[in-house]
């Protein structure tokens, strides 16, 4: 019955394609079948490469043509469907699902209660499929899914012109509705967008165009598929013929995926597979094809983001200085010269009826500030309003224009009247713009500091490298200095003392110590000799090294770290939603409050709600009310709220990276600061993860050198980790550098028990207790006592016998890390409970937990049981972090609120972990928790300041203190306060740059 059920289940998934037995169906299920039908796409969806840059055009035939060859690049979801009783039920479910757009295929198994759906996630979601099944009348639950993401890419855009959270929200919402976009995130602090998209539906250039249509300028940083891309500069004439020759020659090279030639910029962009070709090969082919007419070099590298940042700083500085040229005279004529008798008379001299020279002069001087220097605020306001949103620019434009145009109205009325005395606020609009420009200038300077960590990482790579040249016999015949970007895989690079390692690779000659602190955070130089790996960007301290390049360019560890930190700085913390929600209503609310403030004061003045003595001599009730209204409009600051979280996250992720703690974004930071329970794996986490010999007991009259010569000769052929540990230890007693051991004859290895061999005429056996007993060897009482003693200490005892007699016992252990006990103790002082979960036996587990000070231990746990323990703790209301090596701990790392992969080294792209600890140092666990807590303290203080500033500042600007103290906040002072609030938030976050990790023992 079971066999027939399985056959029916498999045949159900096989569909009606016919043919094939059960084994063929099984193979298809494992390999994800290629179904005969074409994927159906929405008719409105644009397909990349069809219909020009806009991506339009084409009917269903075009859409199907675009899908050819993409059948295997889909998402596969399996649903548990309950309630089906017959084939008709299965047929109705299958028919309903297949009717959805974006479904590749669907198969339903009525006996197993399963439905497998192959679909394109850009067009339909798992939730939509589940709802469709339920609409048919059955309960459905998603139980498994797999994505084949060859066509799913992530591109990054640098976006110019965003001034506040509202701008970022506008761009984000526009990107999220572009067909083919799965996810879009826009960060104001970094002025970048990260977009996950399906390249079959939309291109990176179309995404750039979508942003530019919102009124912002977008610069493509990376398309997601250009990890092996190079830009080459061409000196010489690029005509149609030479371009054709270059293209055909380059495309003939194995590994070349794409080539684009820009004759105007004299630039060639090539995408290639670094395993098959490299930049030097490409340059050589181009120059050879052009017969010497073209000279090719690496295109000057330029960081668009840094260039934009410097350009923005320069523009704001120039704008501010130019504004001062006009604003200072306006301020002097309205605030200072009016109190100097001689100057006052001259300024009050009438030129047209009641219009004075001073008023005319202020109008002339303030106009360039309002419309030329302040043009950026009009542009920003227009962009926001045209997309149905509002931002800080709207408030500034409204506030300054209200002051300016009322002043224009007032002096024009005076010019046409013989008795009207004008009152102008030209100094208000001019000084407002000047102070806001100053604030923006300081804010951009400060924001630039938040991304210094990435800039420093990128600067670690040396500009040049010394490449060794070999002859056909493998002898070094010369060396050549090349641009480090021209290094190809398998090149041999010479690294001199004090020089930087130019590429990831391994040492093929020489020995030295290398300072890796700038990459891993490891403070002590690491010894390197033949066979050891080195990391690009690290510093060689003493000896000369010859390094064979393995990972170059974007594949290097340094490039991976930079990408990870950049991605982390884009990821929003959940607490950021609070600021996003406020920003949606902030500006409209402030405008309403401003109007209500003006109306309340104006009506109170007209209805004699306050004494006339409250009104300054130079104003009337309307003008007093207007000043209060403008002050409310310009003091309100949504920018401080918008910058509170991302600036702190940016600095924290950069600081963490500099210490070898790679935090994957705001979500990880926010979860880590709540952790009150940490689950530790044992092997490789609390212990060093490598067995070492800790003790040797000789039971016969032998010297250690002779003893280990026999043992190593027997174990040298063993693949067991304990055998390797014994051989490594034996090298200490062996004088020959090559460590050539005596040849073993009649070698026999019994898996899990031991080895035996004939060495120099003696029968040598190395293994455990059972191996000796089954081999007929008597174990003396003294040896049995040692075995019991070692087991109690969680150490493995290896018995050595020669010629049927036990001659010694070797104790091997995976020792705990030197600071493990101190780390557990420190975590306890941080109110964090430590739990050990291991797959090892209870005896070893209890011994280790006792040694490090952990009270709660779970032993003999499989990987899935580790995850269950994490979930059990979470169900009890605990916030759980899991610390493991990222290999067999993946289920638990994923299940935990925060997964920390320790000892990752240069393998920083561990998907299961939220935080990657590059070193094997347990202190970094404390650093990760402590840094997250201090970061969120900063974030909370930022919010307290930003909210407190607005809650207190807006009422003061509205004149709440005026009745009792006659204190009022002039609009230009309110504007200065607004500018200062944003700067203060960024500066408060910048203090995280001076973070020092806790030191044990303090």
Swiss-Prot record:
Induction: Weakly induced by high copper concentration. The chain crosses the membrane at residues 320-340, 354-374, 392-412, 425-445, 585-605, 624-644, 943-963, 972-992. Disruption phenotype: Reduced grain yield. Increased levels of copper in roots. Decreased levels of copper in shoots and grains. It catalyses: Cu(+)(in) + ATP + H2O = Cu(+)(out) + ADP + phosphate + H(+). Cu(+) 1 binds at residues 86, 89. Cu(+) 2 binds at residues 164, 167. It holds the Pfam family Hydrolase. Residues 49-60 have a biased composition (Gly residues). One of its GO terms (cellular component) is plasma membrane. Its EC number is 7.2.2.8. Gene3D superfamilies: 3.30.70.100, Calcium-transporting ATPase, cytoplasmic domain N, Calcium-transporting ATPase, cytoplasmic transduction domain A, HAD superfamily/HAD-like. PROSITE patterns: ATPASE_E1_E2, HMA_1, HMA_2. It is a multi-pass membrane protein. Keywords: ATP-binding, Cell membrane, Copper, Ion transport, Membrane, Metal-binding, Nucleotide-binding, Repeat, Translocase, Transmembrane, Transmembrane helix, Transport. Residues 32-48 have a biased composition (Low complexity). It is found in: Cell membrane. InterPro entries: ATPase_P-typ_cyto_dom_N, ATPase_P-typ_P_site, ATPase_P-typ_TM_dom_sf, ATPase_P-typ_transduc_dom_A_sf, HAD-like_sf, HAD_sf, Heavy-metal-associated_CS, HMA_Cu_ion-bd. Residues 75-141, 153-219, 228-294 form the HMA domain. Residues 32-63 are annotated as: Disordered. GO terms for biological process: detoxification of copper ion; transmembrane transport. Expressed in root pericycle cells, xylem region of diffuse vascular bundles in the first node, and vascular tissues of peduncle, rachis and husk. It comes from the Eukaryota. Copper (Cu) transporter that plays an essential role in promoting translocation of Cu from roots to shoots. Involved in loading Cu to the xylem of the roots and other organs, including panicles. Belongs to the cation transport ATPase (P-type) (TC 3.A.3) family. Type IB subfamily. This is Copper-transporting ATPase HMA5.
């Amino acid at each position: 019955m079971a066999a027939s059920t399985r056959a029916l289940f498999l045949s159900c998934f096989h569909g009606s394609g016919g043919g094939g037995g059960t084994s063929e169906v099984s193979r298809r299920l494992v390999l994800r079948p290629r179904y005969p039908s074409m994927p159906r796409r929405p008719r409105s969806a644009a397909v990349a490469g069809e219909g020009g840059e806009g991506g339009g055009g084409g009917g269903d035939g075009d859409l199907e043509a675009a899908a050819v060859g993409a059948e295997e690049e889909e998402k596969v979801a399996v649903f548990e469907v309950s309630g089906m009783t017959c084939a008709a039920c299965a047929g109705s479910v299958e028919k309903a699902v297949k009717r959805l757009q974006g479904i590749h295929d669907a198969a339903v198994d009525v006996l197993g209660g399963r439905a497998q759906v192959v679909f394109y996630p850009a067009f339909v979601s798992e939730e939509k499929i589940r709802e469709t099944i339920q609409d048919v009348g059955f309960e459905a639950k998603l139980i498994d899914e797999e994505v084949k993401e060859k066509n799913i890419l992530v591109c990054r855009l640098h976006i110019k012109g965003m001034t506040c959270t509202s701008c970022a929200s506008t761009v984000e919402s526009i990107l999220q509705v572009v067909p083919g976009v799965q996810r879009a995130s826009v960060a104001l602090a970094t002025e970048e967008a990260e977009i996950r998209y399906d390249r079959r539906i939309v291109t990176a250039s179309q995404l750039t165009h979508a942003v530019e249509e919102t009124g912002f300028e977008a610069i493509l940083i990376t398309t997601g598929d250009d990890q092996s891309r190079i830009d080459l500069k061409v000196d010489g004439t690029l005509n149609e013929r030479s371009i054709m020759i270059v293209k055909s020659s380059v495309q003939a090279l194995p590994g070349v995926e794409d080539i684009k030639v820009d004759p105007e910029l004299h630039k060639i962009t090539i995408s290639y597979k670094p395993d098959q070709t490299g930049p030097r090969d490409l340059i050589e082919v181009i120059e050879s094809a052009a017969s010497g007419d073209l000279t090719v070099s690496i295109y000057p590298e330029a960081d668009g983001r840094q260039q934009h940042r410097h350009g923005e700083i320069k523009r704001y500085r120039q704008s501010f200085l130019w504004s001062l040229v006009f604003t200072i005279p306006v301020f002097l004529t309205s605030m200072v010269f009016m109190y100097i008798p001689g100057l006052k008379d001259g300024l009050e001299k009438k030129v047209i009826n009641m219009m004075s020279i001073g008023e005319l002069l202020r109008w002339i001087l303030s106009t360039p500030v309002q419309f030329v220097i302040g043009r950026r605020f009009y542009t920003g306001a227009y962009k926001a309003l045209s997309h149905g949103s509002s931002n800080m620019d709207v408030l500034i434009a409204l506030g300054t224009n209200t002051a300016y145009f009322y002043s224009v109205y007032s002096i024009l009325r005076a010019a046409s009247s013989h008795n009207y005395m004008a009152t102008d606020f030209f100094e208000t609009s001019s000084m407002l713009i000047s102070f806001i420009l100053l604030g923006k200038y300081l804010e951009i300077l400060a924001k630039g500091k938040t991304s210094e960590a990435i800039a420093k990482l990128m600067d670690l790579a040396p500009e040049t490298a010394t490449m060794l040249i070999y002859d056909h016999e493998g002898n070094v015949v010369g060396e050549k200095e090349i641009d480090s970007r021209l290094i190809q895989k398998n090149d041999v690079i010479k690294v001199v003392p004090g020089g930087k390692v130019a590429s990831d690779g391994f040492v093929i000659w020489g020995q030295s110590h290398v300072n890796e602190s700038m990459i891993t955070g490891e403070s002590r130089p690491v010894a390197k000799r033949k066979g050891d790996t080195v990391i690009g960007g690290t510093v060689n301290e003493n000896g000369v090294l010859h390094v064979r390049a393995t990972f170059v360019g974007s594949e290097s560890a340094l490039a991976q770290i930079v990408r990870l930190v950049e991605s982390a700085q884009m990821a929003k913390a959940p607490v950021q939603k609070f600021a996003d929600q406020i920003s949606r209503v902030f500006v409209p609310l402030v405008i309403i409050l401003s109007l209500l403030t003006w109306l309340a004061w104006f009506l109170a003045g007209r209805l004699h709600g306050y004494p006339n003595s409250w009104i300054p001599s130079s104003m009337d009730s309307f003008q007093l009310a207007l000043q209060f209204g403008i002050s409310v409009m310009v003091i309100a600051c949504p920018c401080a709220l918008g910058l509170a979280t991302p600036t702190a996250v940016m600095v924290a992720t950069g600081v963490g990276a500099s210490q070898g703690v790679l935090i994957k974004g705001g979500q990880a930071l926010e979860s880590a600061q709540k952790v009150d329970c940490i689950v530790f794996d044992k092997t490789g986490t609390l212990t060093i993860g490598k067995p070492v010999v800790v003790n040797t007991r000789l039971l016969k009259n032998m010297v250690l050198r002779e003893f280990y010569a026999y043992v190593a000769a027997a174990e040298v052929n063993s693949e067991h980790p304990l055998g390797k540990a014994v051989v490594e230890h034996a090298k200490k007693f062996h004088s020959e550098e090559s460590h050539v051991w005596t040849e073993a004859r009649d070698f026999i290895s019994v898996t899990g028990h031991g080895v035996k061999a004939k060495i120099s005429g003696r029968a040598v056996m190395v293994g455990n207790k059972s191996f000796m007993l089954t081999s007929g060897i008597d174990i003396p009482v003294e040896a049995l006592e040692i075995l019991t003693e070692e087991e109690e200490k969680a150490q493995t005892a290896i018995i050595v016998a020669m010629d049927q007699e036990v001659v010694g016992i070797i104790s091997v252990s995976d020792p705990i890390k030197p600071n493990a006990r101190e780390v557990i103790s420190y975590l306890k002082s941080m109110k964090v409970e430590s739990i050990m979960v291991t797959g090892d036996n209870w005896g070893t587990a209890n011994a280790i937990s006792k040694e490090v000070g952990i009270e709660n231990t779970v032993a003999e746990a499989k990987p899935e049981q580790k995850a269950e323990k994490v979930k059990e703790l979470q169900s009890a209301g605990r916030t759980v972090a899991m610390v493991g090596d990222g290999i067999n701990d993946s289920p638990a790392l994923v299940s935990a609120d925060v997964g920390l992969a320790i000892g990752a080294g240069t393998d920083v792209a561990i998907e299961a972990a939220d935080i990657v600890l590059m070193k094997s140092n347990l202190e970094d666990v404390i650093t990760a928790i402590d840094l997250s807590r201090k970061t969120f303290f900063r974030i909370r203080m930022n919010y307290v300041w930003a909210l407190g500033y607005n809650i207190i500042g807006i009422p003061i600007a509205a004149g709440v203190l005026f009745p009792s103290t006659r204190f009022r906040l002039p609009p230009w002072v309110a504007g200065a306060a607004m500018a200062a609030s944003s700067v203060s938030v960024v500066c408060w976050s910048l203090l995280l740059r001076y973070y020092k990790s806790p030191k044990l023992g303090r």
